[in-house]
Amino acid sequence: MSDEETEQVEEQYEEEEEAQEEEVQEEAPEPEEVQEDAVAEEEREEDEEEEKPRPKLTAPKIPEGEKVDFDDIQKKRQNKDLMELQALIDSHFEARKKEEEELIALKERIEKRRAERAEQQRIRAEKEREPQNRLAEEKARREEEDAKRRAEDDMKKKKALSSMGANYSSYLAKADQKRGKKQTAREMKKKILAERRKPLNIDHLSDDKLRDKAKELWDTLYQLETDKFEFGEKLKRQKYDITTLRSRIDQAQKHSKKAGATAKGKVGGRWK
């Protein structure tokens, strides 16, 4: 028997029960205010009830050739409830699985963003180190050029002073001694700078520490620029002193040549 036929039988059965209940309610007597009238009314109603035929209860119509299996109906209802419950459970687990997948995807996106941020910080640090490396290379190149220039100047001084004779031997010795001291000091400075110049490792630093490190580097760069300016002024003074010394040497050489020419003229005059 199909579900539709079963539902039709149940609805028909319920409608007949409701009709019987309405008939019983219509036949119920109303109470009277006077006791005698109530008794008479009850007797009259009893007589009418005896005379009136009672309604016959009829069983629900069942299609011929088929029987209603209430166990089957109850089983189908249970199966329907079970299927609905199983559907709710499946939908709950599907929603839970979807939430877990979204959470895993969110974690993966967060890790990916962290890796990208770390890579960007590393690239930024490398770009920031490039100007520093260029400054260091430029400084080393300038120092090397200055050393070559000083060596050439020293050679020129030696040649100029060697023509002046033994009077300037002590001066050359002192100049060599000073130059040796300067060279030693320069080598010591290079060694100290090489020891102080350490690789900059900032990959593990946080934002606050990076700001502190940047401020520290800025202060160091500012101090280096200040020292550079002071050394430049000192170099200018030294160049001025060297120029003054050269002019004095040239004047001394001129006076010595004039004195030698005068002495030769006197000797020649005597022999004549």
Swiss-Prot record:
Modified residues (N-acetylserine): S2
Ranges annotated as biased composition (Basic and acidic residues): 63-75, 114-156, 184-193
InterPro entries in alphabetical order: TNNT, Troponin, Troponin_sf
Keyword Metal-binding: no
Tissue: Expressed predominantly in skeletal muscle.
Region feature Disordered, mapped onto this chain: 1-75, 114-193, 248-272
Keywords, alphabetical: Acetylation, Muscle protein, Phosphoprotein
Protein's GO biological process: regulation of muscle contraction
Modified residues (Phosphoserine): S2, S91, S162, S169, S170, S206
Keyword 4Fe-4S among record annotations: no
Sequence ranges of Acidic residues compositional bias: 1-50
Chain positions with Phosphotyrosine modification: Y222
A Gene Ontology cellular-component term: troponin complex
Main function: Troponin T is the tropomyosin-binding subunit of troponin, the thin filament regulatory complex which confers calcium-sensitivity to striated muscle actomyosin ATPase activity.
Family to which the UniProt record says this protein belongs: Belongs to the troponin T family.
Name of the protein: Troponin T, fast skeletal muscle
Organism: Mus musculus (Mouse)
